[in-house]
Amino acid sequence: TLPGRTLLRGLAAAGNGAVQYPAALEHARWMTDLPAGDPRVTGALARLTPQPLRPWVERVDMQRFYAMNVPRTYIRCLGDAAIVPAKAAEYAARLGVTPIDLDCAHGPMLSEPDALVRILEKL
């Protein structure tokens, strides 16, 4: 799971209302299928920017979202350390879809870009 709200709020306070994890935590949570020194990891870490805190901690009324008639898909990353497969299955069920499984960590665009493209092209 993601770090607690206290840590997020602390990071946000230090970042003027935005959160950016230390690089080691970014790698440990989202890029576990690639070695730390891999150029894809170092390149991705160099491009990360702080993210606003509000979407992470404020509740959102999802009624309008569920009322929209738009196609939905959920790609479940089976090696994800941030959103474990069981939790991802819950998220997919909430969307009313069967997840499409991909054997990678949280960032398939880094570790499995070709497999991700094949999935997206079928949508």
PLM features: what roles do these ranges have?
Residues 77-110, 123:
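Conserved loop-alpha-helix segment in the C-terminal half of the alpha/beta-hydrolase fold
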Residues 17-47:
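Pocket-forming structural segment of enzyme catalytic cores
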Residues 1-27, 55-56, 60-61, 83-84, ...:
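Flexible "cap/lid" loop of the alpha/beta hydrolase fold
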Residues 67-69, 94:
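Short, well-ordered coil/turn elements that cap or connect secondary structure elements
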Residues 68, 74-76:
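Short beta-strand/loop motif that positions the catalytic acidic residue
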Residues 46-65:
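Active-site nucleophile elbow and catalytic-triad environment of alpha/beta-hydrolase enzymes
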Residues 113-121:
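Short, amphipathic alpha-helical "lid/cap" segments that border enzyme active or binding sites
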